[in-house]
Every structure is written in C-alpha cells, then in structure tokens.
A protein has these predicted regions:
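Basic, Lys/Arg-rich alpha-helical nucleic-acid-recognition elements, primarily the DNA-binding modules
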Residues: 1-95
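Amphipathic coiled-coil/heptad-repeat helices and related helical stalk/stem segments
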Residues: 13, 136-140, 161-165, 195, ...
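Short, compositionally biased leader-like segments
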Residues: 28, 181-195, 258, 263-271
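Amphipathic alpha-helical dimerization/coiled-coil segments
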Residues: 91-142, 146, 151
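Signature of lipid phosphatidyltransferase scaffolds
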Residues: 105, 235-271
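Primarily the HKD phosphodiesterase
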Residues: 143-199
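HKD-type phospholipase D/PLD-like phosphodiesterase module
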Residues: 185-220
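HKD (HxKxxxxD) catalytic microenvironment of the phospholipase D
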Residues: 209-251
Length: 271
C-alpha cells in the first residue's frame, strides 16, 4: 500500500512537470511567483506578453492548484512552492549539462550514481579545464598545482600515476591526511611501487586510509577543503587526462562528497 501511494505521488509529480514544460508561459509564471507575489502588470512588464496569454497561463496554473489569487495579486500555493523549487533545480541541472555538454556527452557517466545526478545543480559554479594543441598537459598540470596546495585529500583513484603520488606524499609529510579509494589493479601497482612503504608508515600514524572498491572505477575524483575536481573515462574505456571539471565552491565540494560517500559505502579497507 505504501509503495502504491509513493508510485502514485511520483506519477502525479511527473504529469505536473510535463504539463508545465509543455508551455514557455507556465514555468515563467511559476518561477516569477517563487520570488514574490505578482499582479497582472508585473507579469506584463517582466514577460512582455499580452494580458490574454498571461491570464490563460494563470488560469491553467490555478486549475491544478499551483497558484492562488487574492484580489489582484497571485501567489504560490503550498503545492506550487514545492513544484517551483523542483522546477528551479531541474533548470539548474539542464544548465550544467548544457554549458559542459561535450564533457558529459563524450565520456562514460555510468559510474556516477543517480543520487549524485539528482543533486547535480550543486555543480553550477564549476569551471571546465581543458588542454589544447599548444599545451597538451595543461589540464593535468593545473590539477597537480591544485592538489599540491591543498590540505587533507579524499580521492577516488582509478589509475596509477607516479607524479600524482609524489605530490600526495609531499602533502602527507606536511601533516595532511589521505583517504584513497581505488581498484584492485591500482592497489597492486601501489604495493609493488617504491611509494608503498611510505604509505604504510603514514597509515600507522593515522594519516592514510586506503580502501578498495568492489567494482570497476570510471571516475577520477579529488575532494579537498577548498576544491573538488572530476575527470572521466571515454566511452571506449580509456582514461581522458585532457580535461576535468573544477569547482571551488561549497556546493560543488558537497556534491563531490556525496559521490565519494557512495563509493566509500561499497569499499573495503586495505591499509
């Protein structure tokens, strides 16, 4: 019974959103009202549309209980407040994927769980960093500069990179901490590398924790106190070190922690 009620609610929400998006006028009216109550003149000035079109849209929103009218003013109903908030998040999500379209379209995103995608609006202030023909290492060098100056590090590491590990060890020597989530191949490479004994020593001091994911990794994620970065694999399985998403805002770092926690839940401690 609870499942049926939940399904019915989600279906009704879907129908409402689909109804709103079938018109340019309806979402515009709803989002205006999310800022403040408005009258017909307010709508006319902002939208530059004739009164007849605006009134038609308002009546449609009133009919499905998203807005209410009090004399000459219109305001959101309780249902309308919730719907407008969902609509704003949807538009923010679409904007994020639009401005970085090539990044998302050209790479595999199968390793990013739905929970993270539902909150992708948190990435709205991200910067796309990309190498070019004049500097093929531009993106990776930018990443190394960033991680070299950060404090505590939480990293999902799907590939073995010596340059990367050398900088991490320098940070550890400065007293920073590392949480590393990786796969079987990278962990095996770490164990046979010249860096492993140092990592073991730092682990004994409580500075390092290395965990192994129980499935293949197709994301390279770094989370620090003041930035996050995300790079992905091509759809053919090759890692792309030529570009990454960078975010230095609180919301972007929150999104990265959501993604990292999902992998943390499905990992086992190795060191």
């Amino acid at each position: 019974m609870i499942f049926e009620e939940d399904f019915t609610k989600k279906y009704e929400d879907f129908i409402t959103v689909r109804f709103l998006l079938a018109s340019k006028m309806r979402p515009s009216l709803l989002l205006m009202l999310s800022d403040s109550d408005c009258n017909l003149n307010d709508f006319r000035e902002e939208l530059e549309k004739p009164s007849a079109s605006i009134l038609h849209g308002l009546k449609e929103l009133e009919r499905i209980n998203l807005i209410k009218k009090n004399f000459k003013n219109y305001s959101l109903s309780t249902k309308g407040i919730l719907c407008s908030a969902s609509l704003e998040k949807l538009f923010q999500d679409l904007y994020i994927f639009q401005i970085n379209r090539d990044f998302w379209q050209n790479h595999s995103i199968d390793s990013i769980p739905q929970d993270a995608f539902r909150k992708s609006y948190l990435l709205r202030d991200s910067v796309f960093v990309e190498s070019d023909e004049h500097n093929l290492s531009k993106a990776f060098n930018k990443y190394l500069d960033l991680i070299g100056a950060c404090g505590d590090m939480k990293i999902i590491l799907p590939i073995f990179l010596e340059e990367h590990l050398e900088i991490i060890l320098e940070n550890l020597e400065n007293g920073d901490n590392l949480l590393l989530i990786t796969n079987e191949d990278v962990f095996s490479s770490l164990k046979s590398s010249k860096y492993y004994e140092e990592l073991v020593d730092f682990s004994k001091k409580g500075q390092v924790s290395i965990r192994k994911a129980d499935h293949d990794l197709k994301v390279f994620l770094t989370v620090c106190d003041d930035f996050m970065s995300l790079s992905l694999f091509y759809k053919d399985g090759l890692y792309d070190n030529s570009c990454f998403i960078l975010n230095e805002q609180k919301d972007g770092i929150e999104w990265a922690n959501i993604l990292l926690d999902k992998y943390l839940e499905n990992s086992i401690k190795m060191l």
